[in-house]
């Protein structure tokens, strides 16, 4: 018995403790189910419930599951592309589905025969989102509602983080009539390592794919046209639809808005297939990007290197004055990630000339991300040291006139605490194809060239060395501003017993292609039971994408010890 007194009046209520202690509890449920992007895929969610007592123990009673409308009032017929198996409690969603909201209601009986029920609201969402008040009849058809209370959670799979308010006039016919304003981040779970075409109707500032304080996201809006960034739009005062290509390295696409009004976002996955021949993309600063640098010359003159072009096409992606931070925030790494096709190669190593405020071990985390990002997008990675110091004012030590030898190979924190450490940590990963020591090889090639001074037309070793020294306008740059191409040519082609960059690329690619792997053929009966397994030695160059049918699966793996697929899905 409970006695309640309010304003001088007393009411006595008798409660049945046994009845109230029994209830229904969902033992498995999901509040959000994503519409798959792939026509062959099906997204499922499991729902189950039990009648429990006051101590939470399952009483073992029957519970039925039914589908009701979003308000949990009337039974609801699921639209095309969505089905519910009540006996198994499975909601299945195909790519034919459209966004909708419904309720899964669980019903059972208490010990005295009274009806017990509990419900969970389920949002089936695609990747088209209408931002606004969330009022009934305000969400544009085919879009999923995002309102001030739609906070991002792992379970929901989409939503916002930050402070927002709803503004504008809600309309079911116009997705831009209302919007959310403020400083906030929108997140949506997507498939890891894929490229997405994202349409955003907004005003204000936008940054995509925040990683860390150092890699604070690709800046997508500028006040005016400029050449510092790529993949951006000019900031507008009015809500305007903009389109961006966004590579997503992890499984969450994030868009950070500042001083913004956001009306809608649509996200579409872009499928990419392997090129007829792999591409080599090169991450770097001006030491590879500028006129006269080895990467600039190799990309321009690669027809002169048929042994390399038979294996891959080379691209110079160096950008002057960039560091690990700005190469990312200004979109240049994204530009590579966008263009990567399965089986492409990325070289990473010439990005330490401009420290960008980093020192010591601080280089390693951004470099690790660069590697992880390229691998996630389907590329293989070759790590390199970077080009040598020139023997100019302040760097006279680079050439020793007594021993007639160069020592320009850099040994700073970027190199010794960054790129070389990463290679040692990852060298057993088959997707890290190798390490090319550009700086050390340059020293050795220069030294052999100097030792061969007479053959090369010089009076003595120092004269030959001076010809190399004269290629450098400063300690970083060589072969530019009309200077001799000798230093760059020696780096590219090597000299004597020292290999050049071209032959090293050929070596690494050839060794990778000839690496052994295992072809695994599995046979299944109609019930999915494995009935036969065959393994055959193969080479990486022979590997194909997984071939599936109802009764068979053919895949290629590096080895049984290293169960990594040669070609990722």
Regions found by a protein language model. Name each.
Residues 11-18, 116-125:
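C-terminal edge beta-strand
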Residues 22-30:
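Proline-enriched interdomain boundary motifs that mark the N-terminal boundary
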Residues 7-9, 109-114:
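Short, solvent-exposed loop/turn segments at the edges of extracellular beta-sandwich modules
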Residues 126-292:
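Compositionally biased, intrinsically disordered or flexible polar/acidic segments
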Residues 48, 332-484, 489-493:
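Alpha-helical cap/lid subdomain in secreted, periplasmic
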Residues 1, 89-99:
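Extracellular/luminal low-complexity segments enriched in Ser/Thr/Pro
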Residues 131, 255, 268-319, 333-346:
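Serine-esterase "nucleophile elbow" of acetyl-processing enzymes
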Residues 26, 35, 57, 68-88:
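Low-complexity "stalk/linker" and mucin-like segments enriched in Ser/Thr/Pro/Ala/Gly
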């Amino acid at each position: 018995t409970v006695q309640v007194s309010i304003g001088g009046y007393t009411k006595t209520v008798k409660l049945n403790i046994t009845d109230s202690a029994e209830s229904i509890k969902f033992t498995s449920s999901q509040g959000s189910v994503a519409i798959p992007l792939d026509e062959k895929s099906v997204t499922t969610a499991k729902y189950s419930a039990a009648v429990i007592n006051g101590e939470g123990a399952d009483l073992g009673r029957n519970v039925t599951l039914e589908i009701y409308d979003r308000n949990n009032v009337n039974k609801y017929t699921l639209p095309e592309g969505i089905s519910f198996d009540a006996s198994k409690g499975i909601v299945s969603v195909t790519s034919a589905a459209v966004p909708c909201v419904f309720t899964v209601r669980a019903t059972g009986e208490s010990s005295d025969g009274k009806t017990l029920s509990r419900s969970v609201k389920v949002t089936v969402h695609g990747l088209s989102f209408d931002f606004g008040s969330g009022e009934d009849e305000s969400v544009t058809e085919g879009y999923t509602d995002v309102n001030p209370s739609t906070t991002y959670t792992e379970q929901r799979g989409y939503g916002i983080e930050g402070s927002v308010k709803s503004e504008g006039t809600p309309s079911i016919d116009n997705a831009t009539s209302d919007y959310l304003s403020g400083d906030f981040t929108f997140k949506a779970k997507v498939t890891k390592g894929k490229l997405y075409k994202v349409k955003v109707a907004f005003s204000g500032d936008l940054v995509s794919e925040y990683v860390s304080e150092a890699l604070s996201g690709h800046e997508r809006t500028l006040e005016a046209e400029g050449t510092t960034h790529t993949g951006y739009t000019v900031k507008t005062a009015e809500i305007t639809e903009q389109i961006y290509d966004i590579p997503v390295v992890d499984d969450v696409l994030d868009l950070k808005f500042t001083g913004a009004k956001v009306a809608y976002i649509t996200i579409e996955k872009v499928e990419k297939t392997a090129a007829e021949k792999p591409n080599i993309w090169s991450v770097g600063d001006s030491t590879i990007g500028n006129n006269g640098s080895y990467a600039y010359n190799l990309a321009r003159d690669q027809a002169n290197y048929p042994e390399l072009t038979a294996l891959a096409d080379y691209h110079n992606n160096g950008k002057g004055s960039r560091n690990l931070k700005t190469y990312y925030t200004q979109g240049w790494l994204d530009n590579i990630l966008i263009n990567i096709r399965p089986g492409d190669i990325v070289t990473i190593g010439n990005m330490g000339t401009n420290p960008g405020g980093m020192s010591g071990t601080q280089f390693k985390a951004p470099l690790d991300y660069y590697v992880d990002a390229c691998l996630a997008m389907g590329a293989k990675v070759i790590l390199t040291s970077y080009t040598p110091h020139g023997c100019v004012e302040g760097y006279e030590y680079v050439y020793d006139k007594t021993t007639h030898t160069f020592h320009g190979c850099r040994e700073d924190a970027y190199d010794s605490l960054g790129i070389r450490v990463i290679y040692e940590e990852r060298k057993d990963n088959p997707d890290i194809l190798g390490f090319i020591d550009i700086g050390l090889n340059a020293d050795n090639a220069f030294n052999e060239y100097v030792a061969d001074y007479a053959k090369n037309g010089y009076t003595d070793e120092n004269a030959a060395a001076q010809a190399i020294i004269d290629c450098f306008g400063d300690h970083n740059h060589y072969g530019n501003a009309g200077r001799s191409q000798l230093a760059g040519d020696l780096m590219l082609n090597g000299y004597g017993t020292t290999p050049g960059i071209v032959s090293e690329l050929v070596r690494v690619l050839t060794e990778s292609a000839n690496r052994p792997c295992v072809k695994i053929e599995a046979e299944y009966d109609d019930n999915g039971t494995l009935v036969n397994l065959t393994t055959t030695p193969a080479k990486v160059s022979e590997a194909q994408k997984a071939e599936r049918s109802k009764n068979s699966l053919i895949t290629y793996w590096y080895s049984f010890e290293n169960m990594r697929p040669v070609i990722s899905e």
